[in-house]
A protein has these predicted regions:
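Extracytoplasmic low-complexity, Pro/Thr/Ser/Ala/Gly-rich segments
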Residues: 27-96, 196
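Short, well-ordered beta-strand segments enriched in hydrophobic/aromatic residues
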Residues: 99-110
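Surface-exposed edge beta-strand/loop patches
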Residues: 18-19, 152-196
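The feature marks short-to-medium sequence segments in extracytoplasmic or secretory-pathway proteins
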Residues: 108-157
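Bacterial N-terminal signal peptides that target proteins for export
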Residues: 1-5
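Bacterial Sec signal peptide processing site at the extreme N-terminus
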Residues: 19-29
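Hydrophobic core residues within well-ordered beta-strands of beta-rich domains
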Residues: 67, 99-101, 162
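C-terminal motif of bacterial Sec signal peptides marking the signal peptidase cleavage site
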Residues: 12-16
């Protein structure tokens, strides 16, 4: 029966529906892209491999938890990856290709946090300005070469890190332009431009 049901995948587009409301302290600013002036709180653009500032958990179970995200590598998949993933074709929205983002999640302080609570704010920005959240798979798991699904329920204590790979689906013909880390409604996202 599961083979006939197929996998149902939802790629959520970011349309301002981040429910974090984290209330983080720091300077709001106008989102200036100048990273040379001011403190590290104002820096918005990073190189792949560069750690984010500490982020506060938006989950009630770990509300005092703080963590960092370090996107390290971005790779665009192929049509064959998509065909072999186990996902049904989405004829309504056109063909998609996967983009894989490897990141290191590091729990810095506070209550133990689940891996899924630390990577759920990652966003893929395309060269056309489109933004897509990570692929959420229901009723079966998608399979990607060299990008295993992370154990989202694994808990990390302060000082522990986990290397994860996250898959995003973007329209075929578009390119990955940047990995973004959403910081809620009122703060500009952090960005790691893709240079390849």
């Amino acid at each position: 029966m599961p083979a006939t049901v197929g996998a149902l995948a939802l790629a959520l587009a970011v349309t301002g529906c981040d429910d974090s409301g984290s209330g983080k302290r720091g300077k709001g600013g106008s989102g200036s892209h100048s990273s040379a002036s001011g403190g590290s709180d104002e820096k918005k653009t990073y190189r792949l491999g560069e750690e984010s500032p500490e982020q506060e958990s938006s989950k009630t179970t770990s509300k005092d938890g703080k963590y960092t995200v370090t996107p390290t590598k971005v790779e665009t998949g192929t049509k064959a990856d998509m065909e072999n993933s186990g996902l049904k074709k989405d004829d309504k929205n056109g063909p998609k290709i996967p983009v894989y983002v490897w990141s290191t999640l590091t729990h810095k302080s506070g209550t133990a946090m689940e891996v899924g609570d630390m990577d759920d704010k990652l966003v893929m920005k395309t060269n056309t300005g489109g933004r897509t959240r990570a692929l959420i798979v229901l009723m079966g798991a998608a399979k990607w070469p060299n990008c295993p699904e992370p154990d989202s329920s694994k808990k990390l204590s302060p000082g522990q890190s986990e290397k994860v790979c996250t898959a995003f689906l973007i329209p075929e013909g578009q390119k990955a332009a940047a990995v973004e880390l959403s910081q809620g409604y009122y703060k500009a996202p952090l960005e790691w431009p893709v240079t390849n």
